[in-house]
Amino acid sequence: VGNSGTILTSSDGTTWTSRTSGTTEHLYGITYENSTFVVVGDNSSGSGTILTSSDGITWITRTSGTTNSLWDVNYGNNKFVLSDGAGGIQSSSDGISWTSRVGIDTYGIWGGAYGNSKFVVASVWGYIFTSSDGTSWNNVISRSANALNDVVYENSTFVTVGVNGTIQTSSDGTSW
């Protein structure tokens, strides 16, 4: 996914095909689970962008319920969880209908991941938040004085990355 509604698909990772997304918004995050792709993006039209697809070819616009840009989307604990540029969190069991959750940081959540039975999201102000259910969130003060851009979970380790070369690791999402 990328600028101006760009969605590319590939069956081999070498040859890529451009797909019609139905939007000109910049797209920032994508995840796939339960036979559903969910893509999130910008809000220049007045609403954060959510697109879904069962095949990666045909895309349907969904209602986001927010005027904020949507930065990332993840799946875990039987639900999709997305974050927005103003710290809002939404969750969905199907990627189609979304429920707003209590905002966790007024300065924006840029990236997140699911692993070790919890969601972990990172903020532009260097804070990290965790949730086991995608609904109730705990603030974990990170050691970073820098903006954090994303979180991944692999090999039993969460990794955050941010500006000025910031990299932090955690096995539990709480101690960094």
Predicted regions and their residues:
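Residue-level hotspots at or immediately adjacent to binding/recognition sites across diverse folds
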Residues: 1-176
